[in-house]
Amino acid sequence: MSLGLNAVYVASHWDAVTEGAAAAGREAPSRSEWRIVRDVWVAETDEEAREGAINGMLGRAWREYLRPLFSAGAYPFVSFMKHDESMSDDDVTIEYMMENLWIVGSPETVTEKLRNLYHTVGGFGHLLWLTFDHAEDSEAYETSMRLMAEKVMPNLQDLTGN
């Protein structure tokens, strides 16, 4: 699963899919079947999106649960979140994740970030938007979903994974 991982590492997941298919004597599936998981937050402006991501449930879930979980154990998952292996684990902050791993911004920024992700990983067919319980601010969540549906996705129809 691509949850919270840097795009270059996620791209290697497709290599594992094709290698596994070959080892099983099967034809590799189409990239259009590949699903990529990303944390997404869209608002009218980049500033509003950053504020909503950091101070809303997205930031809270990573700050209080996922980031600590990914740092635990003998093989901390946090190492796959870094864009540079020489980074300290402590440098993988919520702000770092928002800038480098999450898809956060205005509709224009989110469109650009999703295009960049698509090209970095070599193409995919489905974006799975990881979401959390936004009951405390359902209006902002609904706005984010609406902007994604109405302002972002129509501009990405050419990205089919083929």
PLM feature spans:
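Active-site-adjacent structural elements that line small-molecule/cofactor binding pockets in enzymes
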Residues: 1-162
